[in-house]
Amino acid sequence: MIPTIALVGRPNVGKSTLFNRLTKTRDAIVANFAGLTRDRKYGDAEFEGKRFIVVDTGGISGDEEGIDSVMAEQSLQAIAESDIILFLVDCRDGLTHVDSQIAQHLRTLHKPTFLVANKVDGQNHDLAIAPFFELGLGEVHSVAAAHGRGVNTLMATVLADIAVESEADEADAERRLKMAIIGRPNVGKSTLVNRMLGEERVVVFDMPGTTRDSIYIDYERDEKHYTLIDTAGVRRRKNVKLTVEKFSIIKTLQAINDANVVILVMDASEGIVDQDLHLLGHAIESGRALVVALNKWDGLEDDHKSYVKTELQRRLSFVDYADLHFISALHGTGVGNLYKSVEKAYQAATEKYSTSFLTRILEDAVTAHQPPLVRGRRIKLRYAHAGGHNPPIIVIHGTQTSEVPNHYTRYLEKVYRRALELHGTPVRIEYRSGDNPFAGRKNKLTERQLTKKRRLMKHVKKKK
């Protein structure tokens, strides 16, 4: 599973700065979900090919009241759900009582915890970090998050132990189609899971009991092997009523990153709400293949159905590549049709293509619509090759590729989507510029060229 790293510490110790550096963004993703703190931030990150989720848990000052105490409590929940903890302290402030309190709590969790001394720049390194050894958390890793100093060394240490596990997960994904069922609370995720697993043709292996964590369920349907990742964390049992679902954004993000295909479940009776779009954004950002299911469809009046369809066209136009299903998980209407879309999306997301084929598509696209001029010179796109799958990545080589405008990239995405019949999956375009061996070198003119240049210059002067 993709590991989750929680950034923990007092307010203003640099958690957001480190978060932005790790996720390479200034605009932190704010998860504004019901029942969750408003300022907890989540983002996907990658370091040396290893993917992970970063959580900025918000500051814990120790004297919270009212809403602050709720936010602190939810920060503790995020810490408890994470796999690795980066505990940030401020070298300029030195060791504080709140730092000691937080350290005391972290020691009780028995999780991999790395003590990170931030803002070490401009200070005597050894003197600045010395007080923090008192916290009893082992080695002190010094960084200057604002400038990026020490961050790569820190992350290499933090992620060293998960390398083998990540490779094993990737190998396992090749053998079995993993699909994650995600959605906000009470849209019918658990009912859909039970319906999908309850079909007569489904053979479930080692059915787990009730748990609040995401559940990985291996099963077989029509001689095809699947792993279903259930983020709702509740199971059907005889004579037991459905329990209240505990929604966890961390578990949802982990499930998205670990899946090949994501099924986003929405409540048709409520239409599309902002929380649905937040989750959809995470799925798109991860690059996973996508299927959208509108649940509770059979209970709607015809007028409301028309309204919902209009809203879908208006608000989900940016994911027009995803199949849309109108289902009733409770009665089973339309549920079986999900598999066809899942298989099609998975096939498109994992297909392999030759360099010659991708280059031919590029050449046709450039012939039909040339890249724009930049400072009087035409951007040249020479050849393309595959750079990865799930999502499909097309790497295009050429000159001045850093100047390719967004609208032209969108054009190429549409061309490749149409040519490769990429149904149900996003496609990503990456550019590479070849190094110019003559960059920075002046041409040395021959004697004959110098004579010609002087003659031309005389002609220009006479005209003036």
Curated annotation (Swiss-Prot):
Record key words, sorted: GTP-binding, Nucleotide-binding, Repeat, Ribosome biogenesis
UniProt entry tagged with the keyword Transmembrane: no
Positions with a binding annotation for GTP 1: 9-16, 56-60, 118-121
The organism's place on the tree of life at top rank: Bacteria
GO BP annotation list: ribosome biogenesis
Xref: InterPro entries: G_ENGA, GTP-bd, GTPase_Der, KH_dom-like, KH_dom-like_a/b, P-loop_NTPase, Small_GTP-bd
Transmembrane regions: none
Chain positions recorded as GTP 2 binding sites: 183-190, 230-234, 295-298
Domain KH-like: 351-435
Every EngA-type G domain range: 3-166, 177-350
GO molecular function list: GTP binding; ribosome binding
Any Pfam family the entry gives: KH_dom-like
Cited Gene3D superfamilies: 3.30.300.20, P-loop containing nucleotide triphosphate hydrolases
Recorded family membership: Belongs to the TRAFAC class TrmE-Era-EngA-EngB-Septin-like GTPase superfamily. EngA (Der) GTPase family.
Functional summary from the UniProt entry: GTPase that plays an essential role in the late steps of ribosome biogenesis.
Quaternary structure annotation from Swiss-Prot or TrEMBL: Associates with the 50S ribosomal subunit.
HAMAP family linked: GTPase_Der (MF_00195)
Protein name in UniProt: GTPase Der
Lineage summary: Bacteria, Pseudomonadati, Pseudomonadota, Gammaproteobacteria, Cellvibrionales
